[in-house]
Amino acid sequence: MGICCSKGKEELEEEGFPWKHDAFFHDQLWSAGVSMHTKQGWKGANQDAMTTCQDFAGHKGQIFCGVFDGHGPLGREVARHVRDVLPVKLSSSLALKTEQDPSSNTDKETLEKSDCTSLSDTSNEKQLLSTWKNIFVKTFEDVDEDLRQHSGIDCICSGTTAVTVVRQGDHLIIANLGDSRAVLCTRDSKDRPISVQLTTDLKPNLPSEAERILNSKGRVFAMDDEPDVPRMWLPDQDAPGLAMARAFGDFCLKSHGLICTPEVYYRKLSAKDDFLVLATDGIWDVLSNKEVIKIVSSATDHSKAAKQLVERAVRTWRRKFPTSMVDDCAVVCLFLKPSPSSSESTPGDAKPPQAVSFTGSFRKVLGGGGGEAEEGTNVWRALEGVARVNSVVRLPRMGAVLSWRRRSTSLEEDDEARID
């Protein structure tokens, strides 16, 4: 699958790994133009996770990055499990798709032969977008099913978001689930850095999300003391009050409109694009897209950009909301141009392989449950300076939990009967 770096210093120390290898991991990450950092908030264990995989799926120069924001009693375990399993399953799905359909344009040789200069070949473009959408959607569903059957992690009221990206040469394919976010830094006509939000924060109050939830007998409303924070609730209980409309896990809500289907996006990179920031809502709740881009752009040492961004977010939490608990933060910064230091240290590196032959500047493939958003339209965002809340308000009563377990057991018995 490639070289992966997923675990922070604290997690490695928990597992008895000597942190004397810090410099090695730092160099390995930065050789791929990646800066990543996470910091525990004031709510207990750090439930955020992140990962980066170089030479992903066996393709030289291809990279996978992801951040995951866990919630609920076992949110930490869910986020770590998805972090470890998702890249493996996605890599396997890519390999299987290439083996079954060599013309799918997901393998290196086909991609290099693809004509990606024509904007008029819309049918081929749609086919490619559809191929990537299907791969991501199937992989996310497999990971969610893996969680459902996991005997060591109770995911009834625990789950995680995920925002992931695969970079293949000049092409970005992004898959988003929940309210973590991907933001690109590009340059305007005067060479000034500007932010472009590439994902939609999938909150319960988005019209398409709310419609799906209500059609499944779920409920969407905000509590009196949090009028600006819409939440998702069970039909007959004011629980769990989930602050997002899509997530891995949270199986008590999966029959009531919560889905694990990601929205899949595509962007063709240009010479004006500088870097991509993936981050959990601990960042976006206190810093705007513009502020994040400014902080990362101003980092004199790009390899430390993620750490500086997290530290700024923590200071902003304390200054703006002194009575609120600082949230966990996780950031991955993917720099899209080689730095002078990295190009000097690796002069013999091969040119990254050509990639998915998508055309156009920015396109989105919906993974279900939403309407198509045209380029340049406004996107729903996390509430800046307001969403200082837990992702889950309260756990449902035992009756709802037992009901979910009965449905889950029934599904497993049906599957076994069909196999027999």
UniProtKB/Swiss-Prot annotation:
InterPro entries: PP2C, PPM-type-like_dom_sf, PPM-type_phosphatase-like_dom. GO terms for molecular function: metal ion binding; protein serine/threonine phosphatase activity. Residues 96-119 are annotated as: Disordered. The keyword Manganese applies. Pfam families: PP2C (PF00481). Residues 106-115 have a biased composition (Basic and acidic residues). This is Probable protein phosphatase 2C 73. The lineage of its organism: Eukaryota, Viridiplantae, Streptophyta, Embryophyta, Tracheophyta.
